Amino acid sequence: MNFKYIIAVSFFIASAYARTEEKDVQSLSQRDVLEEESLREIRGIGGVLLSAGKAALKGLAKVLAEKYANGKRTAEDHEVMKRLEAVMRDLDSLDHPEEASERQTRGFNQEEIANLFTKKEKRILGPVLGLVGNALGGLIKKIG
C-alpha cells in the first residue's frame, strides 16, 4: 500500500510540475506577443512623429526659399538657398530613397560644375598671381 501512495504522490508532483512549466511557457509567449505589440505601437508613433517633423521642416524650408527667391540675394543669401535646397533634397530622399540618387545625379548641373571649377581656379590662380605680383614688384624696384 505504501508503494501505491508513493506512485500516486510522484504522479501528482510530476503533473503539477508539468502544468507549471506549461503555464510558464504560455506566459512567456503572451509576454512576447505583448512586447511585440507595444514595439509596433512605438514604431507607429515614431513614424507619425517623424513624418510630422519632416512636413514641418519642408514647410519651413519652402517659406524661407520663397522669401529669398523674391528679393535680391547677396552671396550669403545664395549660400542659405543652397543649404535649403540640400535640406529639401535630403527630406525628399527620406520619402523616396530610390529616386534620390537619380535626382542627385541629374541635379549636378552646369552651374554647379562651373562653380566648382571657379573655386578650383581661385585656389590655383591666387598663389600664382601672388608670385607673379611679387616678381613684377621686385623687377620694378630693381629698374627704378
Swiss-Prot record:
The modification Isoleucine amide is found at residue 143. The keyword Nucleotide-binding does not apply. Residues 1-18 form the signal peptide. Keywords: Amidation, Amphibian defense peptide, Antibiotic, Antimicrobial, Cleavage on pair of basic residues, Cytolysis, Fungicide, Hemolysis, Secreted, Signal. It is found in: Secreted. GO terms for cellular component: extracellular region. Expressed by the skin glands. Belongs to the bombinin family. This is Maximins 4/H3 type 3. It comes from Bombina maxima (Giant fire-bellied toad).
